[in-house]
A protein has these predicted regions:
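Ubiquitin-like/PB1-type beta-grasp interaction modules and other compact soluble beta-rich domains
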Residues: 1-18, 22-31, 42-81
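Short, structural beta-strand-to-alpha-helix junction motif
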Residues: 34-36
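Carbohydrate-associated surface elements
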Residues: 39
Length: 167
């Protein structure tokens, strides 16, 4: 396992190598790594896109305040969106997928918003998409929400068992 950015020392257990997947590519790390530290060690710099303009974003901090590294964790039917890469402990077989991109993180078609940024001022959608009124809930709002970049739930049955349920 070649990790160009891996430093000597640290609080990881180098005797326990782990493998994980990020956006369909397999990488390696060690027990005690976070997803962020393993990605940085493997030379992965691009982990997300900005919400409005879809500009490329990388990891800039090591704590829970990290704004750029939101991923979706998958395990069978379970999907956990909006997980922070700096707070996700690495485990063998971890599957993480970046969010807020279409079709891929490296080539995001929504990045055209960056080129149109002069025309997309704050709250532009409240002024622009007012007519016809019936289009707001059925057309405009779903498109804007999809472009906003937060994760989506799986839609499959929750495999967990709970003591109580509320509806």
């Amino acid at each position: 396992m070649t990790q160009v950015n891996r430093l000597d020392g640290g609080l990881i257990d180098r005797s326990t190598p782990l493998s994980f997947t990020f956006d369909g590519r397999r990488y390696g790390g060690f027990a005690g790594d976070t997803l962020a530290s393993a990605l940085v060690a493997n030379g992965v710099r691009l982990v997300g896109r900005s919400f409005k303009y879809h500009r490329p974003r990388g990891i800039i901090s090591a704590g829970s305040e990290e704004p750029n590294g939101l991923v979706e964790l998958r395990t069978g039917a379970r999907r956990e969106p909006n997980s922070r890469v700096t707070m996700t402990e690495l485990h063998d077989g971890l599957v993480a997928t970046s969010q807020n991109r279409f079709p891929s993180l490296g080539f995001d078609l929504m990045a055209v918003n960056d080129r149109l940024s002069n025309f997309l001022g704050a709250g532009f959608y409240y002024k622009t998409f007012m007519w016809p009124k019936a289009f707001w809930e059925r057309v405009y709002e779903p498109i804007i929400r999809r472009a906003a970049g937060l994760g989506a739930l799986s839609g499959e049955d929750d495999p967990d068992v709970y003591d109580r349920g509320f509806r």
